Amino acid sequence: MFITCISSTMPIVSFKSFLSRLWFVTSFYFLGTQLFHNFKNIKRFIWLYVISLLIIIGYTIYRHHQFQFSEKSAIWVMSPFYNDHTAYAAVICLFLPIFIGFIFDRNYTTIIRIIAFFITCIFGVALYLSYTRAAWIGISVAIAVYFIFLFRIKTSLVLTGVGMAILLFFIFQTKIMMKLEKNHQDSSTDISKHVQSISNISTDASNVERINRWNCAIRMFKMKPILGWGPGTYSFKYAPFQHSREKTIISTNAGDKGNAHSEYLQPLADSGLIGSLSFILMVIAVIYRSSRLYIRAKDKEIRMLTLGLLLGLITYFVHGIMNDFLDTDKLSVPFWGFLAILVTMDVYHSRKTV
């Protein structure tokens, strides 16, 4: 990222972006690895964060109730704590698998497990009322990954299945796109209709605008494929890359509203192939090392916590296809904190009973 700051088209913006990211990583990852040498600090971090999150959830649900739990008000009722419902739901998804694990972990007292059950229920209600489709998809994928661990399905079979799915998509992509374009169901408070609207790429303004941003990021990458335009520059540079036929009621000619809506495409535009590959390789490394830690950890509590953390991160890895929040403190704190916990458990706690 530092290298692409030097070659940036807006050096001041890029160095500012670099310093803010460096602050997140230094504070929540590097210092976190030192803090989590003491296993009790891992629990303190999780519980203290969740206690504050529960207060925000209570505030959000109370405000949402004043607007009859409408889908439109769900977008902003969590402000000023979160900018919108997507970041709010993403954080809930990070912690939800951990507390489900607490319910079934007999290392905890009955009281703690009961409290974890009620917190899980609150998270479930909050997630439902957020009307955040990306978060729902993330949770669905995490559930699928859980069953892979539960039934000990071999990695080769999983990779073969994913490869076959990708191959079938490319073979039938024309028919698939024609089918998707016939879906005109917009977002709704009706759960079945809201889920159906996920695949609406024709009339749902949120979905179509997201595709517009993705296409802009890809066009920017094609113009500067190696080092990109510079960290943090997408928001200032994407406007000329919009095509009129792809614009929505949300779009602006100035291109002054938001980012690329993808943790994978944002660095592709900002830092070129190097930036995008760096994030993808980190995702692969986290999944691989966490899976190894889960398999070889001797202590059951370590195993359960590892699985909860991994599934929580997977919800964000999936969510990150459609949104990007790691440039904000709201997601950077739990994200880098989770990575610090996993690394610390792998290095210091995996071969002993805590």
Task: Please name every model-derived segment.
Residues 1-6, 23-27, 41-74, 81-152, ...:
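Alpha-helical transmembrane segments of multi-pass inner-membrane proteins
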Residues 69-79, 201-215, 219, 223, ...:
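Long extracytoplasmic/lumenal interhelical loops at the membrane interface
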Residues 58, 64, 125, 129, ...:
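A membrane-periplasm/extracellular boundary helix in multi-pass inner-membrane enzymes
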Residues 7-16, 128-130, 321-326:
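Membrane-interface helix caps and helix-loop-helix hairpins in membrane proteins
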Residues 161, 279-282, 307-354:
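Transmembrane alpha-helices of multi-pass inner-membrane enzymes
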Residues 1-12, 18-19, 32, 168, ...:
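A structural signal for hydrophobic alpha-helical transmembrane segments in multi-pass membrane proteins
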